[in-house]
Amino acid sequence: MHTYGVVECSRQITQRMGLPEEDRQLAQLIGLLHDIGRFEQLKRYNSFEPNTMDHASFGVQILFEEGMIRQFVQDNTWDSIIRTAIAKHSDYKLEGIEDSRELMHARIIRDADKLDNCRVKLEDPIETMLGVSAEEVGKTKISPEVMEQVYRKESILSQTRKTKMDYWVSYLAYFFDINYEATFQIIREQNYVDRLINRIPYSNPETVAKMEEVRSIIHF
């Protein structure tokens, strides 16, 4: 399950960073709670698509306005850190955080979320993620607007994705938004970049060439 995968990724990242035990435990708690708004999104809309609702904001509402956070931690000492990290974990860009510890935990959960998403994208059926077979995905092209964002080493804006390959490239573009060397170490050790790129059998010649460009740009 993704939630527990994020908890484990948070543990690994904070351990490699050499953080104090309190911050390690706090990062794992944030990992456990970061997608709590997803359950309501699924209940209401039967979808995880970002245009149905802001699951991060709803998670904050459930935890702090409705008081569910006290079921997980009695002390309110860390409420501001937890609230900020969860509220910001799915933002396109991480902005507007002035407190250094809040910023650190917001960066950790974003890294851990993306790191476990690598596992998810390798293990889940392509049909489940994209609605068609891997072979069908590999027949499609990458839109110029999406490639321009890759060239700029930016995450892909959801509204610019038009083809199935656009969606697949958007998963790879997560790597442009990694914050910590500890996370990069795990990505390299697991060979996630090549494994994800190689999962799709590309048959469109233009796509084959573009994906080699993507590979060379992302590799670090």
What is each model feature region?
Residues 18-29, 69-87, 101-108:
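Acidic/histidine metal-binding catalytic segments
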Residues 15-18, 41-45, 68, 155:
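Short, flexible helix-adjacent loops and helix caps
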Residues 4, 8, 12-21, 33, ...:
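Divalent metal-dependent phosphate-bond-processing catalytic cores, especially two-metal-ion Mg2+/Mn2+ enzymes
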Residues 46-54, 70-74:
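Short coil/turn segments at secondary-structure boundaries
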Residues 5-13, 53-68:
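An active-site-proximal "capping" alpha-helix that borders the catalytic cofactor pocket
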Residues 24-51, 59, 80-92:
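His-Asp-centered metal-binding catalytic motifs of divalent-metal-dependent phosphohydrolases/nucleases
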Residues 65-71, 89-97:
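Short acidic (Asp/Glu) patches
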